[in-house]
């Protein structure tokens, strides 16, 4: 019986792949480098293709790998059944540093109406992909949302504000379009194909929101919603009937307030964010503890995280989880994208 060979890597050591001859010269070929096809003198040689280097796409930051205790940071008896704690590990990925803005999403719908109308149909694009601008009036009874309904998505005044009125399915379509746009460019310039853009899993979102701080109740790390000067640290509803105390009665610009330690803006408040996972009250026992995600195509409810401009502080907590039906569009739900980081992690090679 042949014993398996296990290659392990310790901190600060050279890559174990270096032992397999990657990047080295062929001693049998007179010192010449191994060909790109990995075959030399009738033998297959361990080598890597040159020219590949994954860097953070524009507007994204690298979220390192790590381990976190998912769930409520504080004891919450009422939520114990749906927010149980579990230790999980997350591999590195890239994440948008802000929520997807009106300006960014407008480029998507403009592209759809120009390039894809013959395939998808104008009715589908307008009913499914175009933001429901009437959500500002429909979400609240006896509320005058005419100004936001008429101008929020179309006016330059709101270009850098997070897009809302987007269903989970529309967010997924945006990710697919963004992936094609990026890889078409890379293909034209003979570059390697990039991993796809997608929605974050709940575990990825929670890990990123905490900014590397173990057990952080809020993205800024401490358990308070205001700083020492009494200024609120996010866009939410701090008092009964007072939406203006933080400076913004509705949404705020996507880069408002200070970022967390990973460089992410508005991971608490402003707009709640769609996640990839389906919602289940007690899904943690059935998911793995490495890169967990709960996919159930028969479950129409999808996880939203982060709380919004209309929510009280409880919904801003990193461990708080709630849901919305995938086809619903709200004035307080947006999204941001992530992308897998492939291969070794900078600083650990």
Residue ranges of model-derived segments:
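Functional-site microenvironments in short loops/helix caps that host divalent-cation chemistry
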Residues: 26-40, 63, 69, 74, ...
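Short proline/glycine-enriched turn/loop segments at secondary-structure junctions
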Residues: 293-296, 322-329
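Bacterial N-terminal signal peptides
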Residues: 1-6
């Amino acid at each position: 019986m042949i014993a398996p060979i296990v290659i392990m890597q310790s901190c600060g050591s050279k890559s174990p792949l270096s032992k397999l001859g990657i990047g080295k010269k062929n001693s049998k070929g007179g010192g010449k480098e191994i060909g790109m096809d990995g075959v030399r003198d009738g033998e297959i040689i361990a080598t890597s293709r040159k020219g590949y280097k994954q860097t953070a796409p524009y507007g994204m930051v690298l979220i390192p790998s790590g381990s976190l205790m998912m769930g409520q940071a504080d004891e919450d008896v009422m939520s114990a059944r749906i927010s149980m704690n579990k230790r999980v590990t997350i591999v590195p990925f890239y994440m948008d540093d802000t929520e997807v803005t009106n300006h960014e999403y407008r480029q998507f719908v403009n592209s759809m109406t120009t390039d894809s109308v013959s395939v998808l149909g104008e009715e589908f694009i307008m009913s499914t992909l175009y933001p429901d601008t009437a959500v500002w009036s429909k979400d609240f009874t006896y509320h005058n949302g005419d100004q936001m309904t008429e101008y929020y998505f179309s006016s330059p005044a709101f270009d850098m504000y997070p897009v809302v009125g987007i269903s989970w399915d529309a967010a997924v379509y945006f990710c697919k379009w963004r992936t094609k746009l990026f890889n078409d460019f890379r293909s034209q310039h003979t570059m390697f194909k990039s991993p796809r853009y997608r929605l974050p899993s709940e575990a990825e979102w929670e890990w990123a929101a905490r900014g590397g701080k173990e057990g952080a109740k809020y993205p800024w790390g401490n358990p308070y919603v205001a700083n020492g000067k009494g200024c609120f640290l996010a866009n939410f509803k701090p008092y009964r009937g007072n939406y203006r105390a933080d400076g913004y009665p509705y949404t705020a610009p996507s880069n408002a307030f200070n970022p967390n330690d990973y460089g992410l803006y508005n991971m608490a408040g402003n707009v709640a964010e769609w996640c990839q996972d389906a919602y289940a009250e007690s899904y943690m026992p059935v998911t793995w503890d490495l890169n967990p995600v709960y996919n159930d195509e028969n479950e129409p409810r999808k996880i939203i995280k982060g709380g919004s401009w209309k929510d009280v502080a409880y919904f801003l907590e990193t461990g708080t989880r709630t849901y919305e039906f995938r086809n619903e569009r709200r004035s307080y739900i947006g999204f941001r994208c992530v992308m897998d980081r492939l291969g070794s992690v900078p600083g650990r090679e």
